[in-house]
């Protein structure tokens, strides 16, 4: 019976364009996994949406002279266009200004408050008289209270590494205007996360976390403290019965996964369908996020869910990436260290980019994108191994008039060993995808392509054809094409366009392309498709898959 799988990627903040680091961290891995689970025949729902509230949005919208809604709508469209260009196969891309979001955020808050998990508290916060607003930590700097470094950030000193409250800074000032800040009394609602430590630890023990983050998550949960979940802003979801307050963006944003699913259900005219994914314990829920979002997804959002009477689905697996750099430095448009994604895709094919991002994904440690590595991988792996294997086999078949290939009645031992090895690599690739490893999946793809090349070289059908062994040549071509069919299968999650082209050129009897959606190929990774005994290939004119990168 197919499994029901809910997949979410961290909501991109509607405050700027996405770069390769974002894509390699939270979006390509989720897309690859969604495509893989669809191939297995599972009922997959891949959801995402724009995160549209927060002080950074208000400040930047004001700076460029746009209204808040106009500003976030602009970047919502930018993000949607980016995902479309990159082949991110989202089933729905919503936003936190969707018509369902406000009500469910209020419900979460009121439930937590009714259970005594949210209480109001008066505190002193840094306020800018010039800008007439309270400033979040990221917009504050001053002198470190520990080492005396002037220019320390609002929450951490980048010189000595000390962390502190922004109110502990000496001579705090606004990073926006440079004006001195004053302490001003304000009241906020605080979520008593420290009261959720035990249920959170019990929950995390059962969830799948990559080993390199588990200790961090457990330590973080053990040290939870009350956290303000309201802000003094005009842009945000108003807090019930709390005038002039809105919810902190990291309180409302994760709830966006649920409201986005409600939005999707409404879009397909089945308003209650969201419940199949969020209110059924049998659903498998996998989250994909970046490193800096771990605390909110591993502790804060689960705590919010655990505090509800409604049994919302909690994640079964949290897949977090490390940082992805560009030529050894962080992506930064302001500092000129960025890649124009549109210009890049105008120059290079999409699958080249997807492959290199997958092969260098920051799965367990920081990694980087370099143009030299991009060129090397494209030319050596995609052109030299993968593309060469496909092209040489199909070009040879066309040149010599082999169009219809059926499974030979008698396979030689070396053929059977080759076919067994092909199936072994498919099983390995399935294990790699199941464990969320794009890097290892890329290795399996290249291993299978290399295996096919070696087999074709060793059998040397061009020699056999000259010697009059046409039936033997046909058997070799069948085995090579079978390998290519499986190569397209294991490559599809990462190289969907390329896999589709291969299947079109092979036209295998086992695949009805007319009844498949190119972007959502389903129910192929099974014994029927992998079996070769009844296979027939109706070869078409081969097309070059990859070109050299200069």
Curated annotation (Swiss-Prot):
GO terms for molecular function: ATP binding; metal ion binding; methionine-tRNA ligase activity. A motif ('KMSKS' region) lies at residues 330-334. The lineage of its organism: Bacteria, Pseudomonadati, Chlamydiota, Chlamydiia, Chlamydiales. One of its GO terms (biological process) is methionyl-tRNA aminoacylation. It is an enzyme of class 6 (ligase). This is Methionine--tRNA ligase. ATP binds at residue 333. InterPro entries: Anticodon_Met, Met-tRNA_ligase_1, Met-tRNA_synth, Methionyl/Leucyl_tRNA_Synth, MetRS_core, MetRS_Zn, Rossmann-like_a/b/a_fold, tRNAsynth_Ia_anticodon-bd. Zn(2+) binds at residues 144, 147, 157, 160. CDD domains: Anticodon_Ia_Met, MetRS_core. Its cofactor is Zn(2+). Monomer. Transmembrane segments: none annotated.
């Amino acid at each position: 019976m197919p499994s029901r799988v809910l997949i979410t990627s961290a909501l991109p903040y509607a405050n700027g364009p996405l770069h390769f680091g974002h894509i390699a961290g939270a979006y390509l891995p989720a897309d690859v996994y969604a495509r893989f689970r669809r191939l297995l025949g599972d009922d997959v729902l891949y959801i995402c949406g724009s995160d549209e509230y927060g002080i950074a949005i208000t400040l930047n919208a004001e700076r460029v002279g746009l209204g808040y809604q106009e500003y976030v709508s602009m970047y919502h469209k930018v993000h949607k266009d980016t995902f479309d260009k990159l082949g991110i196969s989202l089933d729905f891309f919503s936003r936190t200004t969707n018509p369902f979001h406000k009500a469910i955020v209020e419900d979460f808050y009121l439930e937590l408050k009714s259970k005594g998990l949210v209480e109001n508290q008066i505190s002193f916060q840094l306020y800018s008289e010039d800008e007439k607003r309270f400033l979040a930590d990221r917009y504050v700097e001053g002198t470190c209270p520990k080492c005396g470094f002037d220019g320390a950030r609002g929450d951490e000193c980048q010189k000595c590494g000390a962390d502190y409250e922004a109110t502990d800074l000496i001579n705090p000032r606004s990073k926006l205007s440079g004006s001195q800040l004053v302490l001003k009394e304000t009241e906020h609602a605080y979520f008593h996360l420290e009261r959720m430590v035990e249920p959170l630890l019990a929950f995390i023990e059962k969830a799948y976390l990559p080993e390199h983050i588990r200790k961090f998550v457990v330590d973080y949960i053990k040290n939870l403290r009350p956290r303000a979940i309201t802000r003094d802003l005009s842009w945000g979801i108003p807090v019930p019965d709390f005038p002039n307050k809105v919810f902190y963006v990291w309180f409302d944003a994760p709830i966006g996964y649920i409201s986005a699913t409600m939005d999707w259900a409404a879009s397909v005219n089945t308003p209650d369908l969201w419940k199949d994914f969020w209110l059924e314990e049998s659903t498998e829920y996998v989250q994909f996020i970046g490193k800096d979002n771990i605390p909110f997804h591993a502790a804060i959002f689960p705590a919010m869910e655990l505090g509800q009477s409604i049994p919302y689905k909690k994640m079964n697996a949290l897949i977090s990436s490390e940082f992805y750099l560009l030529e050894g430095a962080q992506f930064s448009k302001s500092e000129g260290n960025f890649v124009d994604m549109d210009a890049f895709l105008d120059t290079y094919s999409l699958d080249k980019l997807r492959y290199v991002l997958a092969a260098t994904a920051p799965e367990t440690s920081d990694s980087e994108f370099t143009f030299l590595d991009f060129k090397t991988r494209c030319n050596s792996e995609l052109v030299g191994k993968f593309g060469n294997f496909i092209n040489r086999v199909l070009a040879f078949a066309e040149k010599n008039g082999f169009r219809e290939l059926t499974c030979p009645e008698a396979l030689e031992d070396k053929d059977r060993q080759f076919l067994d090895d092909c199936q072994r690599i498919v099983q390995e690739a399935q294990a790699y995808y199941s464990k969320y490893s794009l890097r290892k999946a890329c290795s399996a793809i290249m291993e299978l392509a290399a295996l096919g090349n070696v087999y074709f070289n060793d059998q040397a059908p061009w020699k056999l054809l000259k010697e009059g062994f046409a039936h033997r040549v046909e058997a070799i071509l069948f085995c090579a094409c079978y390998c290519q069919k499986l190569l397209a299968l294991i490559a599809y999650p990462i190289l969907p366009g390329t896999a589709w082209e291969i299947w079109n050129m092979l036209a295998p009897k086992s695949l009805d392309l007319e009844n498949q959606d190119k972007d959502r190929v389903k129910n192929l990774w099974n014994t029927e498709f992998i079996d070769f005994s009844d296979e027939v290939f109706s070869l078409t004119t081969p097309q070059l898959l990859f070109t050299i990168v200069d």
